[in-house]
Amino acid sequence: MKLALDGMGGDNAPKSVIEGALLALEQIPNLEIQLYGQQEKLEPFLKQHDRLTIVPCEEVVEGTDDPARAVRRKKDSSMARMMDAVDEGRADACLSAGNTGALMAGGLFKVGRIEGIARPALATTLPTLDGKGFLMLDLGANADARPEHLVPYAIMGDIYAKKVGGLQKPRIGLLNIGTEDKKGNELTKATFDLLKEANLNFIGNVEARDLLEGVADVVVTDGFTGNMVLKSIEGTAGALFSMLKEAFMSSTKTKISAVLMKNNLRDLKHKMDYTEYGGAGLFGLQAPVIKAHGSSNAKAIFSAIRQANTMVEHTVISTITETVRHIEID
């Protein structure tokens, strides 16, 4: 698999990006990486590797840049050149921890949509208490959505869960304010009816409070709601660990308890660690475009690269393309 990697994207770039790339090259035998970035900033962290190629770029898409303008004007940026490589067939997938809006805009302009997918969705695997995780989409690619957008999200999620997660009949849930069939607003009510008729293992409405308990394998929602849920989970997990740390450090007795519970706490942290789950995929494009977390460390970059490699090896995109070609949504 040939991966185009943005070496300049993210809070910890290029150090963590390069470290994650080298780790991936060690563990994924068929992987070849094209690293795009400003050579003078990449070189201090580079190690020679026969499957790592440096592609010098003069510009960088900053987090503060206007997404559409950055893609159009910064043509020699690491992010733009990375997506050009996919568009021109020189890479099978691309990955960046940089500006999310610019990556989505570039994905649409350069990589292109799959025919039949009106609006791509941002999807990622989120943690569950049993450690298996669940796929959720859309996480913010489109703040507004219609029922005919959400049904393809469910189809793409179903294919991903089967191909990558190895599930035979993924449970598809529609995020709602209640589990009853007629709950929700016009969007969820209409989407519910369409999903009920689709050739999917649709289990009905699911509530946000049940997500981390693994109520569904794939959860579908609009981008506005999905983004709020994602950030609520991230914020709650961070606050919870801070409170636990404060509680365990409050006295000698609690410090001893913390030592005794060390393995249990490590397991809990492992389950809730976003670096284990890879990045967010922009589903609905003609090639895998992966967005790693902006604060990704080397481990998170490695996980995102592994995710891209798995998507290519399991032909996720071609399966989505073939499936939606034969589906009509009224």
From Swiss-Prot:
Name the EC number(s).
Answer: 2.3.1.274
- GO BP, one example? phospholipid biosynthetic process
Q: Which UniProt keywords apply?
A: Cytoplasm, Lipid biosynthesis, Lipid metabolism, Phospholipid biosynthesis, Phospholipid metabolism, Transferase
At the top level of its lineage, which domain of life is listed? Bacteria
Any idea what job this protein has? Catalyzes the reversible formation of acyl-phosphate (acyl-PO(4)) from acyl-[acyl-carrier-protein] (acyl-ACP). This enzyme utilizes acyl-ACP as fatty acyl donor, but not acyl-CoA.
The cross-references to InterPro entries, in alphabetical order and at most eight, read:
FA_synthesis, Phospholipid_synth_PlsX-like
Task: Return the broad EC class.
Answer: transferase
| Species name | Lysinibacillus sphaericus (strain C3-41)
- Coiled-coil stretches: none
Keyword set includes Lipid biosynthesis: yes
Q: Does the keyword Translocase apply?
A: no
The reaction(s) catalysed by this protein are: a fatty acyl-[ACP] + phosphate = an acyl phosphate + holo-[ACP]
Q: How is this protein named in the record?
A: Phosphate acyltransferase
Per the record, the pathway is: Lipid metabolism; phospholipid metabolism
Q: Which family does it belong to?
A: Belongs to the PlsX family.
